[in-house]
Amino acid sequence: MANTAQARKRARQAVKQNAHNSSQRSTLRTAVKAVRKAIEAGDKTAAAQVFLASVSTIDRIADKKIIHKNKAARHKSRLAAALKALA
């Protein structure tokens, strides 16, 4: 339990920030799943478009430090490899 005004405020901020970060992580997972689904469908052009959109999302979330930049790079690399293998 927070005892000072500052600690109470930081606790409130932490709850709000946690909710926002959780939402952003969910957006990331949705973007990755969308690319995987497009790749499984077998349409390379559609998958490439979804991939470009998801790369933007992944980079934006990494820039905000919600995920580590290396994790973002790993996601992008694996999705790109899967897209390339679709040929």
Curated annotation (Swiss-Prot):
SUPFAM superfamilies: Ribosomal protein S20
GO biological process: translation
Pfam families for the chain: Ribosomal_S20p
Ranges annotated as biased composition (Polar residues): 20-29
Stretch list, region Disordered: 1-29
Keyword check for Transmembrane: no
Record InterPro entries: Ribosomal_bS20 (IPR002583), Ribosomal_bS20_sf (IPR036510)
GO molecular function: small ribosomal subunit rRNA binding; structural constituent of ribosome
The entry's keywords: Ribonucleoprotein, Ribosomal protein, RNA-binding, rRNA-binding
Role played: Binds directly to 16S ribosomal RNA.
Similarity section: Belongs to the bacterial ribosomal protein bS20 family.
Designated name of the protein: Small ribosomal subunit protein bS20
Gene name as annotated: rpsT
